[in-house]
Structure formats: C-alpha cells, structure tokens
Amino acid sequence: MQIMLCAISNIASGGCGEDCKYCTQSAHVKTNINKYKRKDIDQIVLEAKMAKKNEALGFCLVTAGAGLDDEKLEYVCKVAHAVQKEVEGLLLIACNGIANLEQLKELKKAGIFSYNHNLETSKEFFPNICSTHTWEQRFQTNLYAKEVGLMLCCGGIYGLGESEADRKSFRASLKELDPFSSPINFFIPNENLKLKQALLDPDEALNIIKDTKKDLPNAHIMVAGGREVVLKERQYEIFDAGASAIVVGDYLTTKGEEPSKDIQKLKQMGFSFASSCH
C-alpha cells in the first residue's frame, strides 16, 4: 500500500478577521502564534525542498483570512511559480479560503493541482462555530474549484461539540462533493480559544476515520491536525482504519511528528510513499 504524504507551508499567518471558534489564527482571540502577512518566497522554496526530501507528494500553500483578494492571489501565484521552478514532482495545493471562479482559474493557470477548502462540520452545526461567513460559501467555493478543473481537497474538524447526526450530515455533504482527498482534523483544546471541548478519545477518533472511509470510498482519507495529540502511541492505527494519507511535519500553528519518525515507522510497517497522483 502507498501512503500519500503532504506538507504544509503557512505562507500568511494569523490576524484573520473571521471568528471560527476552533482557530488560533483568528484575530478575535489572543494567542502567541507567529503572525506575518507574507512569508519570504525563498523560505517557502526551502520548505518545499525539505518536503520533497521528506517524501511528500503534496505541498500546501495556506493563507490566513476569509478568502482571496487581488494582492493575495498574485502572491500565491508567484509562490507557485517559484516552487515549480526549483522543485520537481510536488503537487501544489492552495488553501486560501473563499474564492470565486476567476480566482480559481488563475490558481489553476499558475500550476495549482488541488484546492483545499474544508466544510469543517455539518451545515446545521456550522453557525455554532462561526458567524462571519456561512457554510454555504464554503460549499460553493468547492463547487467552483471542481468547475475550473482543480482537484478537490475537502474535509473538516471533529471534536467541536457536534452530534453524531452532525457528523453524518457533514459526511453526506462531503460525499456530494466527491473530493480527491479529505482531511480529518481533531480539535486540540487551547486555553485562549472560546471553544471549550475535551480531546476526543482515541477509539472515537479511529471510528471517525472508519466512518469517513465508508462514506468516501474513493477519496484519499488524510489524517491531519490532532493526529499525534489525540491518538498518541496509537496514531499508526489510522491506516487499518482506512486512512491513506497524512500530513508530514508541522501544521499551521501546532507541532507535528518528526518527519523522520513518521517515515521510518511507515517503512517498518511495509508502506511505500506515493510519488504520483493516482
């Protein structure tokens, strides 16, 4: 079995005007995360080279904020061109919030392979975690991404206080979108966040992966944020549960597993690493 590894570069961090209750990048909460408007492009290229060295196939360019404006779009396209010039064989993923058809067309022209815009949770539960934009705006952005020919990376976050009915509704919406890959994140409590929820139990987290694979049999199920914190020593059981992709290295504002540990463990388990999209 091949495992797809993806790395993340937080190319514009913090200061987001949205009020998502689970997110430390929101300007509505005081957190000690690293904040910057633009990361130096040379630094991003170095990170892309490291991602490639760490067996990553996907490299995700993430910007904080509600969505794209002209300036941000131009910057993301410049980054995409620079990475492609210096690093071969990486599939570029853009994660830049709410976007329209024209913006997504520009990203595709710049060499972006896939657009990541998570629904996060069910349509019904979403107003409990965010009031500054709607679930429908997220869903529509995904439809636009598909329309322009971008592959779709769409998932969400569990452990926000949602019910089992919410989880089923959320996965039904994902099934409707039929994404190429679907990230599963697990909420990590933070004293500065307005949302107060305990960590999910490892068994519950593994069952979420199983249920997601059942509902999205054709998608790469990617276990992302919270993997190490929630599952701890059981984190490599995710592959038996149906996952076929993980984030390698650090996340947006939290530390990830050491890439060398992930790579060594996966090799010991008999896995190889995806080097092309299939």
From Swiss-Prot:
Summarize where [2Fe-2S] cluster binds, as residue positions: 60, 95, 153
Q: How is the cofactor bound?
A: Binds 1 [4Fe-4S] cluster. The cluster is coordinated with 3 cysteines and an exchangeable S-adenosyl-L-methionine. Binds 1 [2Fe-2S] cluster. The cluster is coordinated with 3 cysteines and 1 arginine.
- State whether keyword Iron applies: yes
| EC number of the protein | 2.8.1.6
Q: What is this protein called?
A: Biotin synthase
Point out the gene that encodes the protein. bioB
Q: Where is the Radical SAM core domain?
A: 1-227
Matching entries from InterPro entries are given as: Aldolase_TIM (IPR013785), BATS_dom (IPR010722), Biotin_synth/BioAB (IPR002684), Biotin_synthase (IPR024177), Elp3/MiaA/NifB-like_rSAM (IPR006638), rSAM (IPR007197)
Function (record text): Catalyzes the conversion of dethiobiotin (DTB) to biotin by the insertion of a sulfur atom into dethiobiotin via a radical-based mechanism.
Keyword set, alphabetical order: 2Fe-2S, 4Fe-4S, Biotin biosynthesis, Iron, Iron-sulfur, Metal-binding, S-adenosyl-L-methionine, Transferase
